[in-house]
Amino acid sequence: IPALKNAEFVRYGVMHKNIFINSPALLDCDFSMKSKPEIFFAGQISGVEGYVESIAGGLMCGVNAFRRLKGKAPIKPDGATLCGALALYVSSPNECFQPMNANFGILKPLGEEIRDKAKKKEAYALRALAHTDKILTEVSDG
């Protein structure tokens, strides 16, 4: 590439740097600061990894910031949904905290053992949808 003929590579093999806070020490499960609950963190800096995960955290921050302004209790996450599981992950004590993306391994276990992977994922999805409906009802009522 002609335009790069004088380029110098300072460090090989690094595509991006992930900067994040020590969320388990600093954040509550609604992404607000434990010491200053009026301050919220969302996105990569909160310890979630990925675009969708960052958007989900931002949505949770927005909803809970609005609820706080209205004098209402924040929506506390549950490990039944990936959004909730990520929120619990970033706010739970962890000696070696590293950012996490959405994955089935962080979800609250199902009440039953399902060996078929497709059926297990479907069960997780159905449970998450039911829990999301419950949260949406709570948000719209409050």
Model segments located where?
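C-terminal auxiliary extensions adjacent to catalytic cores
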Residues: 100-142
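A glycine-rich dinucleotide-binding beta-alpha-beta segment and adjacent secondary-structure elements
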Residues: 1-48, 55-56, 75-89, 97-103, ...
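Alpha-helical scaffold segments in soluble metabolic enzymes
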Residues: 64, 85, 131-134
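Generic hydrophobic secondary-structure packing signal
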Residues: 50, 54-57, 61, 124, ...
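Internal hydrophobic alpha-helix adjacent to the cofactor/substrate pocket in enzyme cavities
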Residues: 54-77
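A generic structural signal for short coil/turn motifs at secondary-structure boundaries
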Residues: 48-51, 119
